[in-house]
């Protein structure tokens, strides 16, 4: 019951506080149950509850390809068809082209919609009840927020269950605690964290979860081959492919086991046939949808030429700063190499796992948009993460051999540090600081800046001295002392370290100085000072010609110090920042604007700014 309330706290943001309370109850119940030696179900529910409250706090986004996956669910549930024209219209999107059957084209698989359906049904029931009682504003039409948040609930539940199965697959190789450390680390240091909590309406969290199911089923079939275990293994392959057709490469794993057990006479051919049948049966919904949409039982839904099977970008999808698997998520490289350590003791599993990772890289390297548009990290390696987790398990065992006291605490600390890095990277990605390439030098600087912000925020609660100490430790640069002796900020420069939020990219126009647009409603600069003193300052600024009357409020650390008009010609506007509105360490001077002009790129240009002087 507590887990259900926590899920409702995710589905309806108004119940977020109740969701946090429900998680506390679920966690306490799980702890008490474990002390009594109760089963694992209560722990799984508590973990799912934790995922629900994390997602509720993060506030999932429904962007990128989310609509392409969700439209199946909405259209089948409400319209009882696969005609997506009304959904595209409702979302304000251009109509997709017609297929050979006269329906709207949709290249995305149907599998995720089928897995999300139970959670979608719960959200629909909730919306129906609250709408009938007049308690909430949601309309029972499949478009409102509870329906979309239900996708997050489904993805979190799947990742929780899949992660637990992956932990169970490591029984006998690691203890429960050690396996939990490894699996949690693999999730939090990979793109799976992003696609579970931030953009859960895509296939990647589900693909990861089903690949975990596959790994568990493989170990069950390897340990005790039976008709049932082999059927589950085949079913898992079909389910992975149902969520993403590229997931067919996981079939290399049961193929390797079949060869091994046929040689050992440990498996009957009809069991393998049953596995193949189960896989085909699981994949059948996708085949039916392709037939209805495209008029073919089997097709390349993205169109001919989508994959170049020579894989010209194989190295890029692994090592490029533009969404490379090992570049954006370096722990994945460690885990992949760790699979080599498994070869002596588990040659079939380790060899097949390496083959799956390699095949995934080969396919991804041949895809037309190999870097994947609007993607955090190498999202198409979702199915490889469970295998990488096994490599991390092997690496952890080897690394802890020479450690006597709490060796796995060290492993947890290392994975935790990389998880913090990954969470910081996700935050930067959400802020659009990095969208395509993420050069390490810039990324490291941005991460350090975020760390400083966190420490500065904590120090602010303890007073000016604490903030000054943090600034001196993390930055140590001060205007008029050891950097920027004249206090001049060249706003139009290509690289201006003193700009904070609210600025466009630099621009050049004939007859204008180099400048940036200050974006509505606010643009800020950073002013580090060794000692606060009054700053008689000026800003070279002009309003867009199409804004007849622009006003600008100037604030120092949140306090208004001046309100001035902004002319439609370049002018140096003078203002004074009083000493009492400044502190030792970093200060933030902001410029707030009354009106904005939609621009070509960002839609919120408020004023052009070329230079700020704070002498």
Language-model regions, residue ranges each:
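Membrane-proximal envelope and lipid/glycan-remodeling enzymes
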Residues: 1-487, 491-493, 502, 507-510
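C-terminal luminal/periplasmic domains and tails of membrane-associated envelope-modifying transferases
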Residues: 2, 10, 15, 442-615
